[in-house]
Amino acid sequence: MAVDVKSRAKRYEKLDFLGEGQFATVYKARDKNTNQIVAIKKIKLGHRSEAKDGINRTALREIKLLQELSHPNIIGLLDAFGHKSNISLVFDFMETDLEVIIKDNSLVLTPSHIKAYMLMTLQGLEYLHQHWILHRDLKPNNLLLDENGVLKLADFGLAKSFGSPNRAYTHQVVTRWYRAPELLFGARMYGVGVDMWAVGCILAELLLRVPFLPGDSDLDQLTRIFETLGTPTEEQWPDMCSLPDYVTFKSFPGVPLQHIFIAAGDDLLELIQGLFLFNPCTRTTASQALKTKYFSNRPGPTPGCQLPRPNCPVEALKEPANPTVATKRKRAEALEQGILPKKLIF
C-alpha cells in the first residue's frame, strides 16, 4: 500500500506554484502517465481535534462529495492520495476564475457573456441541489474557467448534504459579501436559498464589475443589504423575527433595481429580484431561474470558446484597481479566518 501511494505521488511532475492558503498549497502539474495538465491541492493535515482518521475533515468532505458528482459545470476530482504528512487532491486544471474576468478592466463583458456565465453557474448548481448538496461558499473565485471557456463550480470544503428534517447547520458559512440575510441573522436550518442569494450577488458583480454588497461586519452587511434592497417586513419574510440573532433595523425603502442596474432589461431585473427575495422559502431556485425569460430571450449565451480570456497577468488582477475594495476584501477574509479555515480554489 505504501509503495502504491509513493508511486501515485511520483506520477505527477510539478510545473508551477499556483497559490497558498492557511491549510493548503496548490501546484500546476503534469500527469506523466497521460500527459494531462492538472492542479494538485496539497492539504496539510489538521490538528487531532480537526482530523478524522488522519485526514482533515474539510478535505474528507470534499473528496466524498466530489467522488459522487459528475457534471460538466462541476470541477472534476481525478485522484486523491495521502503522502507523508499531506493529502493531495488532483483536479482538472483550470485556466482562470470569474473574479479575474470581472476585475480585468480591459475586457468588455457583453450581455451574452454574462448570460453564459450565469447559465453555466446555474446548471452546475441545479445539479448539486438535485443531489441534495449545498455548496455554501459560492463567490467569483470559486467559479473556475477552463481553456475552452467552460465554467465549473469548485472548492467544496464547506459543501454539505441537506434535506434531513430538523437538521441544524452552522450559520458561519459563505464569504460575508455573498452571505444570505438568514445566515447573517443566525439561521441554523436553511436550504438552497443560501446558494441562490450568493448567485444573485455574483450576477450583480458581473453587471457592476465591483462587489455588490461589501460589508465590513455581519451588522454592516445587513445594513448594506437593507439600505439597498429595502428592510423586509413580516409580511415579506414571516419567520425573520424568530431567527436566533435577529435584531430590529431601521425601515429603509431601498433603491429600485432599475436604478442600480441601469442597462438591465425587464427579464434580467425579474431574475435579480427573484434571487434577492428575503424569504428563503420563496427565493428563486436554480431550476426556476433556468426557466425564466432571461435565458429564453435574446441575446443567447456566448459559446464557451468565444468567451473573453484575461489579458493581464492573473497576479495583477488579484489586486483590484480599487484599493479600497482590495483592502476590504483582505480584511473580511482575514477576520473570517478566526472562524473558518482560509479557503483555496483547489
From Swiss-Prot:
Post-translational changes noted in the entry: Phosphorylation of Ser-164 during mitosis inactivates the enzyme. Phosphorylation of Thr-170 is required for activity. Phosphorylated at Ser-164 and Thr-170 by CDK2.
Pfam families: Pkinase
E.C. number(s) listed in UniProt: 2.7.11.22, 2.7.11.23
Active-site feature positions: 137
Membrane-traversing stretches: none
Catalysed reaction equations from the record: L-seryl-[protein] + ATP = O-phospho-L-seryl-[protein] + ADP + H(+); L-threonyl-[protein] + ATP = O-phospho-L-threonyl-[protein] + ADP + H(+); [DNA-directed RNA polymerase] + ATP = phospho-[DNA-directed RNA polymerase] + ADP + H(+)
Name this protein carries in UniProt: Cyclin-dependent kinase 7
Gene name of the encoded protein: Cdk7
